[in-house]
UniProtKB/Swiss-Prot annotation:
The influenza A genome consist of 8 RNA segments. Genetic variation of hemagglutinin and/or neuraminidase genes results in the emergence of new influenza strains. The mechanism of variation can be the result of point mutations or the result of genetic reassortment between segments of two different strains. Inhibited by the neuraminidase inhibitors zanamivir (Relenza) and oseltamivir (Tamiflu). These drugs interfere with the release of progeny virus from infected cells and are effective against all influenza strains. Resistance to neuraminidase inhibitors is quite rare. It catalyses: Hydrolysis of alpha-(2->3)-, alpha-(2->6)-, alpha-(2->8)- glycosidic linkages of terminal sialic acid residues in oligosaccharides, glycoproteins, glycolipids, colominic acid and synthetic substrates. Residues 36-470 are virion surface. Keywords: Calcium, Disulfide bond, Glycoprotein, Glycosidase, Host cell membrane, Host membrane, Hydrolase, Membrane, Metal-binding, Signal-anchor, Transmembrane, Transmembrane helix, Virion. Intact N-terminus is essential for virion morphogenesis. Possesses two apical sorting signals, one in the ectodomain, which is likely to be a glycan, and the other in the transmembrane domain. The transmembrane domain also plays a role in lipid raft association. It comes from Influenza A virus (strain A/Guinea fowl/New York/4-3587/1984 H3N8). Residues 89-470 are annotated as: Head of neuraminidase. N-glycosylated. This is Neuraminidase. The keyword Oxidoreductase does not apply.
Length: 470
């Protein structure tokens, strides 16, 4: 075969293969378009399916066309009913770890906000960690001076529980240097306090939209809980303080529905001091354990009914739970009066368990270090010193800080009671450490039917950071 014949033969074979390939494609398209729709199985075309991922429902609209899936993520629909939250608290034998964000450790090399006052609150479908940023990042020059409580740069933001407060996953909630937030079953409600000390304003947000305001009525640093507010059958409750931190101030309880204030009441508490209440629902009422920043080392207790009537006093237990405080052996306790004669204080919490009480406190009597939770027999109603359970969460070699309460709703747990949970803030930096900044991370614990061993889930960041050495 001469060269020309070889070229013709190769060309003919190649042309034949091309024609065969085209014919196969035509047959494939014909079968796909004409034959497959006739088999009566159209279920996969333009189909909306619901899939579950880690307790979060994600709705996907899947459109199939020539073996190609086009997936469109659809916003989660709002619930059409309010949460009840009239169930009793579950009885807890111990508290198991729920989450830990490790924000400061991650922030040494990651884009993590400088924060304080973290807290947790839950909707029917998720729990989120909320925190008040300083408008700056860890290990950055703008973190200098963030020991200051109030500034125009502070904002309330949130992440899914367990995530660090990082810039990539955080969601803006409100401009605020004091805040509270809770979910009524349909939407989130937020109260964010901001502005000058003498004329601060609390802005109520519902579903992300400003819906109402509260003006400072005493002109002395209007402030709120720094933890979850409480919603019962669609009505949400929270407590605010206006006035001095070291003597008699003014206190009010508020009630809102779908972001509009529908009631408020002045809390008469002469000789007592209420700040930074940690509240939770229990048997149709709101129970709060607060901070006395004036004299008491026992904690104020406020129980609010749906009609805004209330009972106010002090945690009866014969053990103090504020910091600083004196020796347990020298403390007698009182259900009605401040005891201990120690100024200052720290945000804390307690849970009623029948007539017992779980009460959290720092291990140190003089500084915000270590953290333990004690169950005191009859401590809700009597000056009892009888500890029937004790659990260490942060050892006394490590810093702690604020602590507060929240509950897991029955929509999340499928139980017939509300699971009691708490968080512990672990403050790092100024004023205790040689840094230019102050920030915190947190550990979150929830009640379980088992005793849990003592351990220390402390912050663990190695300080100082690079910015502190410049």
């Amino acid at each position: 075969m001469n060269p020309n014949q070889k070229i013709i033969t190769i060309g003919s074979v190649s042309l034949g293969l091309v024609v065969l390939n085209i014919l196969l494609h035509i047959v494939s398209i014909t079968i796909t378009v004409l034959v497959l729709p006739g088999n009566g199985n159209n279920g996969s075309c333009n189909e909306t399916v619901i899939r579950e991922y880690n307790e979060t429902v994600r709705i996907e609209k899947i459109t199939q066309w020539h073996n190609t899936n086009v997936i469109e993520y659809i916003e989660r629909p709002e619930s059409d009913h309010f949460m009840n939250n009239t169930e009793p608290l579950c009885d807890a034998k111990g508290f198991a770890p729920f989450s830990k964000d490790n924000g400061i450790r991650i922030g040494s090399r990651g884009h993590v906000f400088v924060i304080r006052e973290p807290f947790v609150s839950c909707s029917p479908t998720e729990c989120r960690t909320f925190f008040i940023t300083q408008g700056s990042l860890l290990n950055d020059k703008h973190s200098n001076g963030t020991v200051k409580d109030r500034s125009p740069y502070r904002t309330l933001m949130s992440v899914e529980i367990g995530q660090s407060p990082n810039v990539y996953q955080a969601r803006f909630e409100a401009v605020a240097w004091s805040a509270t937030r809770c979910h009524d079953g349909k939407k989130w409600m937020t109260i964010g306090v901001t502005g000058p000390d003498a004329k601060a304003v609390a802005v109520v947000h519902y579903g992300g939209i400003p819906t109402d305001v509260i003006q400072s009525w005493a002109g002395d640093i209007l402030r709120t809980q720094e933890s979850s507010c409480t919603c019962i059958q669609g009505e949400c409750y929270w407590v605010m303080t206006d006035g001095p931190a070291n003597r008699q101030a003014q206190y009010r309880a508020f009630k809102a529905k779908q972001g509009k204030i529908i009631g408020q009441t002045e809390i008469s508490f002469n000789g007592g001091h209420i700040e930074e209440c940690s509240c939770y629902p229990n048997e149709g009422k709101v129970e709060c354990v607060c901070r006395d920043n004036w004299t008491g080392t026992n904690r104020p207790v406020l129980v609010i009914s749906p009609d805004l009537s209330y009972r106010v006093g002090y945690l009866c237990a014969g053990l103090p739970s504020d910091t600083p405080r004196g020796e347990d052996s020298q403390f007698t306790g009182s259900c009605t009066s401040p005891m201990g004669n120690q100024g200052y204080g720290v945000k804390g919490f307690g849970f009623r368990q029948g007539i017992d009480v779980w009460m959290g406190r720092t291990i140190s009597r003089t500084s915000r270090s270590g953290f333990e939770i004690l169950r005191v027999r009859n401590g809700w109603v009597q000056n009892s010193k009888e500890q029937i359970k004790r659990q260490v969460v942060v050892d006394n070699l490590n810093w702690s800080g604020y602590s507060g309460s929240f509950t897991l709703p029955v929509e999340l747990t499928k139980r017939n009671c509300l699971v009691p949970c708490f968080w512990v803030e672990m403050i790092r930096g100024k004023p205790e450490e040689k840094t230019i900044w102050t920030s915190s991370s947190s550990i979150v614990m929830c009640g379980v039917d088992h005793e849990i061993a003592d351990w220390s889930w402390h912050d663990g960041a190695i300080l100082p950071f690079d910015i502190d050495k410049m």
